[in-house]
From Swiss-Prot:
Cofactor binding note: Binds 2 heme b groups non-covalently.
Record membrane topology: Multi-pass membrane protein
PANTHER family: CYTOCHROME B
UniProt miscellaneous comment: Heme 1 (or BL or b562) is low-potential and absorbs at about 562 nm, and heme 2 (or BH or b566) is high-potential and absorbs at about 566 nm.
Binding site for heme b b566: 97, 196
Lineage of producing organism: Eukaryota, Metazoa, Chordata, Craniata, Vertebrata
Subunit note: The cytochrome bc1 complex contains 11 subunits: 3 respiratory subunits (MT-CYB, CYC1 and UQCRFS1), 2 core proteins (UQCRC1 and UQCRC2) and 6 low-molecular weight proteins (UQCRH/QCR6, UQCRB/QCR7, UQCRQ/QCR8, UQCR10/QCR9, UQCR11/QCR10 and a cleavage product of UQCRFS1). This cytochrome bc1 complex then forms a dimer.
Main location class: mitochondrion
InterPro entries: Cyt_b/b6_C, Cyt_b/b6_C_sf, Cyt_b/b6_N, Cytb/b6-like_sf, Cytochrome_b, Cytochrome_b_C_euk/bac, Cytochrome_b_N_euk/bac, Di-haem_cyt_TM
Family that this chain belongs to: Belongs to the cytochrome b family.
Protein name: Cytochrome b
Cell compartments where the protein resides: Mitochondrion inner membrane
């Protein structure tokens, strides 16, 4: 009998992508995050769908509709907590996935990497519009502050902001369109994920050594499917622990108050996963300069493949580059901490130094380290 999964037009695609896919034999747990991101996306779409059934995108009822979901809908509290904390897990996996790509030189698959950066931007946009929906104080003021950044664009800025708002301030029209975007964008993310996978399967996965592995491949199933299930168990353990024991740990207390345009919170800040970029934005006193630095902090990922100077792909055997990578990691954690602090000394100067170091590491120090390591590895006569 002919094996159906190898002949059926639809099952053949699934078979080539998830069952008989040739995978390097030495990829570590750092390669688990791609599948975990896919699972996070499915969790977010499903919980979001159930929330959308009860949510109302109207300024008068949005806040109370979220309270209604938590109090009156069967397991509404659980669905809402899973959705809110699922976003945090999504970004945690995203940052680890990007970090692994930088450490092991996966960015040299340029098409896969560039689609990945576009995916990151799309997920960030989705999370931003989603944060506005509960219509709490931080939702309203976060939307006001971040959308106002478009006004820094010369000549068309203010017109652009009012066009995005649908009026002269963040109001009912803004909330309605943000809800529409928040519902639509996850499906765009799902589509881009398929493109991301298509490009990845053109080249095959990278591996910790950063060397071609065509001579030593193993089938994805059962080896890596089992490994991915282990990763899934860890993900669900952390997500459920967060959602059931401390669902508000990563949220902002100000968001428990309904949006009030007449009362500004003492310290406006986004969710934790945007704080590093927010700290870079705030570290520049000029508005346009801050917006450009904010954009550059993410878009800099697009030029990383062109800054690769080392003869070796992976950082596994490059101790100087490794040190700089972990300094970059610590620097990003510092920026995240600074983004959550009020705008006063010593936080201002720490934020400015960390922002300078962030760009310096990626644009100058890491390429120089690659060149120096090439020189050190050159056989001496």
């Amino acid at each position: 009998m002919i094996n159906l999964r190898k002949t059926h037009p639809l099952m053949k695609i699934i078979n080539h992508s998830f069952i008989d896919l040739p995978a390097p034999s030495n990829i570590s747990a750092w390669w688990n995050f791609g599948s975990l991101l896919g699972i996070c996306l499915v969790i977010q779409i499903l919980t979001g769908l159930f929330l959308a059934m009860h949510y109302t995108s109207d300024t008068l009822t949005a806040f109370s509709s979220v309270a209604h979901i938590c109090r009156d809908v069967n397991y509404g509290w659980l669905i809402r907590n899973l959705h809110a904390n699922g976003a945090s897990m999504f970004f945690m996996c995203l940052f680890l996935h990007v970090g692994r790509g930088i450490y092991y030189g996966s960015y040299l698959y340029k098409e896969t990497w560039n689609i990945g950066v576009i995916l990151l931007l799309t997920v960030m946009a989705t999370a931003f519009v989603g944060y506005v929906l509960p219509w709490g104080q931080m939702s309203f003021w976060g939307a006001t502050v971040i959308t106002n950044l478009f006004s820094a664009i010369p000549y068309i800025g203010q017109t652009l902001v009012e066009w995005a708002w649908g009026g002269f301030s963040v109001d009912k029209t803004t909330l309605t369109r943000f809800f529409a975007l928040h519902f639509l964008l996850p499906f765009v993310i799902a589509g881009l994920t398929l493109v991301h996978l298509t490009f990845l399967h053109e080249t095959g996965s990278n591996n910790p050594l950063g060397i071609p592995s065509d001579c030593d491949k193993i089938p994805f199933h059962p080896y890596y499917s089992i490994k991915d299930i282990l990763g899934l168990m860890f993900l669900l353990l952390v997500l459920l622990s967060l959602a059931l024991f401390s669902p508000d740990l990563l949220g902002d207390p100000d968001n428990f108050s309904p949006a009030n345009p007449l009362n500004t919170p003492p310290h406006i800040k986004p969710e934790w996963y945007f704080l590093f970029a927010y700290a870079i934005l705030r570290s520049i006193p000029n508005k346009l300069g801050g917006v450009l630095a904010l954009l550059a902090s993410i878009l800099i990922l697009l030029i990383i493949p062109f800054l690769h100077t080392a003869n070796q792909r992976s950082m596994m055997f490059r101790p100087i580059s490794q040190t700089l990578f972990w300094i970059l990691t610590a620097n990003l954690m510092t920026l995240t901490w600074i983004g959550g602090q009020p705008v006063e000394q010593p936080f201002i100067i720490i934020g400015q130094l960390a922002s300078i170091l962030y760009f310096l590491l990626i644009l100058v120090l890491m390429p120089l380290a690659g060149m120096f390591e090439n020189y050190m590895l050159k056989p001496k006569r």
